[in-house]
Structures are given as C-alpha cells and as structure tokens.
Swiss-Prot record:
Its EC number is 6.3.5.2. This is GMP synthase [glutamine-hydrolyzing]. Keywords: ATP-binding, Glutamine amidotransferase, GMP biosynthesis, Ligase, Nucleotide-binding, Purine biosynthesis. Homodimer. GO terms for cellular component: cytosol. The keyword Ligase applies. It is an enzyme of class 6 (ligase).
C-alpha cells in the first residue's frame, strides 16, 4: 500500500527572503513534505492545510518600518510548533510583545553563536563541543532587543545578545541566523530537530514513495483517457515522460514540437531516446515556420514568451483533436514555477519573468492538466529521473528555458538567427564536455546579439554578428556568480565559433552576476 506522503507536512510562510525556497528544499531532503505560501495567505486555508508545524521565513523588510509584513495572529492561535528564521524571529518577537531595533552594523556572513540555554532545538548540537558554539550564517540589519514574555534567550553572539529564543511550553522557537544555508554547519540538524523531533513528522517524502504516489494519482485522474505530453528533451519533460509511461503505458502520446528554437540536433536525440530506446509513442511535428511567422516583428521578451506559450497550447489542441481519447495535457511544471507565479496579496512580491508552463496558458484551453512534477523542486526532479532509470547525461543536463532559443535571441527571432545560435551553443557545450568543465558549472549557453561588429576575415573587412557566452555557478539559481572559465578554454571556443560559423565575427563572455543581472538575458 502506498504511504500517504502528504500526511505529515510543514507550512512555510514566505516573507520575501531569497532563501525561502532553500528552506523548503532542506526540509524535503530530510524526507518531509512542505509547501511555501505567502505570509498573508488566507487564515482559513492556512489552518485547514493540516500542517504539523509552521516556519516563518526571513525577509528583506524591517519590523521597525510602518506597514512591514507581520506574523499573523491565527498562526499563534493554532497550537502548532512555530519556527521563526531571521525576519521570522523578529516579527514573532514583535507580535508577541518583544521588541526589535536596528543594529549598529549590519551582519552578513559567518558568525559564531554561543548556546546559552540548550533547549529542545539546540540540545546536543555543537560545532565546538567544549564551548557549546555553532558556526552559522547571518544576514540581517535588525535584531531582537527584548524577548516576549515567557520566552527564554537561548543563544547569543559577540555582536547581538539575542541570537535565538524559545518558549518551550508552546513549542515556539526563533533563530536570527539561517539554518538552511550550508555555511550553518548544524543547520540541517536544527531543521531536522524541529521538523522530526518537535513537530513529530515521519520521513515519508522519498523518490520511491513519490513515484508510487504519482502513479496512483495519475491513474485515478485520467482513467482510460489518452494523455499527450510535449516532449522537448529537457529534464522536466523527460522525467514526466518516463513517469507517465510507467503509469499508463500506451495511453501516453508524446508530441515533440520542433519550434525551430531548440538545441542543435535535439529532435533526433529525443526520437532516439524515447521512441527507439524506451518504446514511448512519440509524434514529431515540424512547427518552426508557424513559430517564426508568429514572432515576426516582436521584440519584447514578455510578448515573445506569451506568443510561444500560446502557440504551444494551440498546436497541442490541434493534435488532441485528431485523437478522440486525448483529454489531458501533461506538463513539466515544477514547484518553483508555482511559487513564483503565486505572488503576495500585498503586492510586495514582484514577477520578474512569466513562466512558460504557468503564465502563458490561454483561458479557453480545452484539455485537462496533468502536472506530476508540480510539487517538486528541480533537484527532486533529477533524483526522480535517476530512480526511473533515465541516463545521467539527460537528467543532469543544464536548464533550458521553455521558450527555447526564442529568449536567447535578443529582440526579433528569425530562422537564420536561430540556426547560428544553435550551432554556436552546441560548440560551447561540446568544448565544456571535452574540457571536463560541463559538470563544474551550473548552466552554460550562448546568446545571439542582434548587433553587427567589424571584423577581418581573410584579408577582407567583415561586418557580422556577435555571440555572447554565459556560464554561471550557483546552488539554487536564485543568486549566481559568473564562472571563471580558463582563458585558453574561452579562446578555443571563440576560435571554433568564428571559424566554423559564417556570419559571426566576434564572441564575448558575460561576467555579470545575479543579481543584478538575471541568468538568462531575456
């Protein structure tokens, strides 16, 4: 019998911190299901969610500012264990009768915390046992200056007298540091202590259980109907294909839409892997001309994303109309897409880019939705793929945007631009593999710049296109550093692109971090 993997769960109320999704990923790694909701979500839904504990995340606001997000009263009325992290601890303190103040100096980076009182959260945890100290990561400007009534100060640093607090009878805890980041050495142990020991959650959230659960859910949802899936060869759609093929077999039809904006040779690779190797029913549709016609004269990135998303659905509905049993459209939507598209009722959350799987779906879509990865983070999707038997090279492929090269060609998208870019990108990726650098960077790709640059080809003056190379290192894709690739490697890539591709005279390397830049150029 499949265990109820959602029975024991944690709710994270998001106050806008860059690390909030990381908290959720760490809890999932422990083996417990959790969700991230905006801090101002409706009280009725929060209380009916059935969480065994609530975490208040960090956030960029100051509790001393008028209108700052505040911990909701109904959370404290719930009798559930509560864990406030950074801003979450501060808003907990203020709401319950304590106080906060701005620190003389902001504290960012490594810090050493002295445990004063080893409550249930801290008991037995230490990086320096003889001193009962923890090495942690701080990122705050304000701090708690007075704990609420009945609370105990449990930890301090040389700079702040209240680095942690608790009220054991209520099972309320707060820490000023960030246990979710790897720099806090006992961070995962602290989260486990709260989730498993204090909240009493069982660790049922495993790849094997998720696969069993999703197979049962898919079978119950679709019955004998046919399901169609857009198969691109990316990680998400590949894992969905493998999972659905295992769940419903011949009821699954994968539709590979060649948009003309995919990676070089991707169509043949997709057909070889799924149709020939796995025995999945795959229909290949050449829709490149339709996409390029629809994108003609369109320069705005958001407009391009919407057009690509809407045309994607239109093509699928056309294919479904040929299949009388096709009632469902499967998609590779993953949990970060859902979180970032939800937003906050207060308007404090801002949409940076719409998501191909979430933001571009037309309201009149006639197919039902099947999204078996909707609850999963990317690292969970990869582990699921391995458990399903997919090749490592496919599962650990770098991310590729839903709109494809359409958002890596700046401005208007043309067929000749897409062909040049796909070839340049293929050269870059090939050289990364040859130099054993591919797995050392988190994401790498080429970008087509719609500007021409003067060059010399042979003895003649040339006026040709510019290709930008982008490679980043990141843990969570919320922040990223540009990858310091060796100069001789970049020289090799540049020479190959310029020599092998007619129409390119210059190659540049993007050395922008995130923030301020995003990883993708559009």
């Amino acid at each position: 019998m499949t265990p109820n993997i959602h029975h024991d769960k944690i709710l994270i109320l998001d106050f806008g911190a860059q690390y909030t999704q990381l908290i959720a990923r760490r809890i999932r790694e422990i083996g417990v299901y959790c969700e991230v909701w905006p801090w101002d979500h409706s009280p009725e839904e929060i209380l009916s969610f059935g969480a065994k504990g609530i975490i208040l995340s960090g956030g960029p606001e100051s509790t001393t500012s008028p209108g700052a997000p505040a911990a909701p009263q109904h959370v404290f009325d719930s009798d559930l264990p509560i864990f406030g992290i950074c801003y979450g601890m501060q808003t907990m303190a203020v709401h319950l009768g304590g106080a906060t103040e701005a620190a003389d100096k902001r504290e960012f980076g490594h810090a050493s915390v002295q445990v004063i009182y080893p409550d249930t959260l801290f008991s037995g945890l230490s990086d320096h046992p003889s001193e009962f100290r923890l090495d942690v990561w701080m990122s705050h400007g304000d701090h708690v200056s007075r704990v609420p009534p009945c609370f105990t100060i449990t930890a301090a640093t040389d700079r702040i007298p209240i680095a942690a607090m608790s009220r054991e009878d209520k099972r309320w805890y707060g820490v000023q540091f960030h246990p979710e980041v790897t720099h806090t050495l006992q961070g995962q142990a602290l989260l486990r202590r709260f989730v498993v020991d204090i909240c009493g959650c069982q660790t049922l959230w495993t790849s094997a259980n998720i696969i069993e659960d999703q197979i049962a859910r898919v079978r119950e949802r679709v019955g004998c109907d046919e399901v169609i899936l857009g198969l691109s060869g990316g990680v998400d759609s590949s894992v969905v294909a493998a999972l659905l093929h295992k769940a419903i077999g011949s009821q699954l039809t994968c539709v590979f839409v060649d948009t003309g904006m995919l990676r070089w040779g991707e169509g043949d690779q997709v057909m070889a892997m799924f149709a020939e190797h796995m025995g999945v029913n795959v229909v290949r549709i050449n829709a490149a001309s339709r996409y390029f016609d629809a994108l003609q004269g369109v320069y705005d990135p958001e407009a391009k994303r919407k057009i690509i998303g809407n045309l994607f659905i239109q093509i699928f509905e056309e294919e479904a109309s040929k299949r009388k049993q096709a009632k469902w459209l499967a998609q590779g939507t993953i949990y970060p897409d859902v979180i970032e598209s939800a937003g906050s009722k207060t308007g404090k959350a801002h949409v940076i880019k719409s998501h191909h799987n979430v933001g571009g779906l037309p309201e009149q879509m006639t197919l039902g939705m099947v999204e078996p990865l909707r609850e999963l983070f990317k690292d969970e999707v990869r582990r699921l793929g391995v458990a399903l038997g997919l090749p490592h090279a496919m599962v650990y492929r770098h991310p590729f945007p839903g709109p494809g090269l359409g958002v890596r060609i700046l401005g208007e998208v043309k067929p000749e631009y897409a062909e040049l870019l796909a070839k340049a990108d293929s050269i870059f990726i090939d050289e990364l593999h040859q130099a054993d650098l591919y797995d050392k960077v988190s994401q790498a790709f080429a970008v087509f710049l719609p500007v021409k640059s003067v060059g010399v080809v042979g003895d003649a003056r040339a006026y040709e296109w510019v290709i930008a190379l982008r490679a980043v290192e990141t843990v969570d894709f919320m922040t990223a550093h540009w990858a310091p690739l060796p100069y001789d490697f970049l020289s090799t890539v540049s020479n190959r692109i310029i020599n092998e591709l007619r129409g390119v005279s210059r190659v540049v390397y993007d050395i922008s971090g995130k923030p301020p830049a995003t990883i993708e150029w559009e």
